């Protein structure tokens, strides 16, 4: 059993998600101690519990200590079963963070898996569903991940109520070299249970700033009913994306400009993937090998690298230049 210090680095929930995902995939039991030790509310939060329970169900794992507020758990995985599963995170817990946790493990399932996840689709401190679909998954496909994803209903803070469906097939992971893709900018601006002009103003402000900086873009408008009112915008070009969420007291124009500015920062760097995707791809480059560049190495990325190296006994290197190059020969 491998022991993981959950307080290492940024000491957040990502250590838990990555550890349990790689444990499930490899069959290696893990003990995680000091979970979120330095956070205002230490221990497992509800969405971490749901993620561990979901992987335990899919892999018929034995678990110890998996409950709200727990600072130490053990996870002893079994075989990863095919089938259909439902996971309700509750309120507006992030569906994309849970899928990030499930996806590496599901590549090694015995057969096709379909997971329906209910919770928050566009919430703070996590990728949006549009980012997952249009930026992260296409990059993961290059590593051999065979998965499709659709959002059936958006869910905003605080009630959530979003519904997404992830379908996977057994995948043979392979090394991938992610090159810079220079292509047009696309986007989706959306609002739920709010007037359509909210989404349109977000899009118009983003388009204006992008045009001012010399970029053309196409942004689709989506409106729908939702359990809680909310809005957001996601922009992308190749493997670089950005997003911003509306909130009470913030003008729609400011939301649009926030997303546009973040994407412009990524495009100017000439790196092949954005800062957040660099973090999300660590399990795949650790398993299969490959390389990509990013403009910055976040604390999340460094912590994820440390976690993957602890479990997989692989080596992931970072070369610093005008951009950072992350590369690995994998764990095979």
UniProtKB/Swiss-Prot annotation:
Keyword Kinase appears in the UniProt entry: no
PANTHER family assigned: RNA 3' TERMINAL PHOSPHATE CYCLASE, RNA 3'-TERMINAL PHOSPHATE CYCLASE
Molecular functions (GO terms): ATP binding; RNA-3'-phosphate cyclase activity
Listed EC numbers: 6.5.1.4
The organism's taxonomic lineage, starting at the top: Archaea, Methanobacteriati, Methanobacteriota, Stenosarchaea group, Methanomicrobia
Locations listed in the record: Cytoplasm
Disulfide bonds: none
Protein name, per record: RNA 3'-terminal phosphate cyclase
Keywords: ATP-binding, Cytoplasm, Ligase, Nucleotide-binding
Pfam families documented for this protein: RTC, RTC_insert
GO biological process, one term: RNA processing
GO-annotated cellular components: cytoplasm
Active-site residues annotated for this sequence: 300
Main EC class the enzyme belongs to: ligase
UniProt cross-references to SUPFAM superfamilies, sorted A to Z: EPT/RTPC-like
Catalytic activity: a 3'-end 3'-phospho-ribonucleotide-RNA + ATP = a 3'-end 2',3'-cyclophospho-ribonucleotide-RNA + AMP + diphosphate
């Amino acid at each position: 059993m491998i022991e993981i210090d959950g307080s290492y680095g940024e000491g957040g929930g990502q250590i838990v998600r990555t550890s349990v995902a790689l444990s499930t995939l490899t069959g290696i039991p893990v003990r995680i101690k000091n979970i979120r030790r330095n956070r205002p509310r230490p221990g497992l939060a509800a969405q971490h519990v749901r993620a561990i329970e979901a992987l335990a169900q899919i892999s018929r794992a034995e678990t110890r200590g998996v409950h709200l507020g727990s600072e130490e758990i053990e996870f002893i995985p079994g075989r990863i079963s095919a089938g259909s599963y439902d996971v309700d995170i509750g309120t507006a817990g992030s569906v994309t963070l849970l899928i990030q946790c499930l996806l590496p493990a599901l590549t090694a399932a015995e057969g096709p898996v379909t997971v329906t996840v209910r919770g928050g689709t566009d919430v703070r401190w996590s990728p949006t569903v549009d980012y997952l679909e249009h930026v992260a998954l296409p990059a993961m496909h290059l590593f051999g991940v065979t998965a499709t994803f659709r959002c059936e209903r958006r869910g905003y803070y605080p009630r959530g109520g979003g519904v997404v469906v992830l379908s996977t097939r057994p995948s043979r992971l392979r090394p991938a070299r992610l090159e810079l893709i220079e292509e047009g900018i696309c986007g989706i601006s959306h609002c739920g249970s709010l007037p359509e002009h909210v989404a349109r103003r977000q899009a118009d402000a983003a388009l204006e700033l992008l045009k001012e900086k010399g970029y053309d873009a196409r942004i689709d408008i989506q409106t729908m009913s939702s359990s809680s009112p909310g809005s957001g915008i996601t922009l992308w070009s190749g493997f670089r994306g950005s997003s911003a969420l509306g909130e009470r007291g913030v003008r729609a124009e400011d939301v649009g400009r926030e997303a546009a500015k973040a994407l412009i920062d990524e495009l100017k760097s000439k790196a092949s993937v954005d800062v957040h995707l660099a973090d999300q791809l660590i399990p795949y480059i650790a398993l299969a090998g490959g390389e990509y560049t990013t403009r910055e190495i976040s604390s999340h990325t460094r912590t994820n690298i440390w976690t993957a190296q602890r479990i997989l006994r692989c080596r992931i290197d970072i070369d610093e230049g005008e951009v950072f190059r992350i590369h690995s020969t994998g764990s095979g």
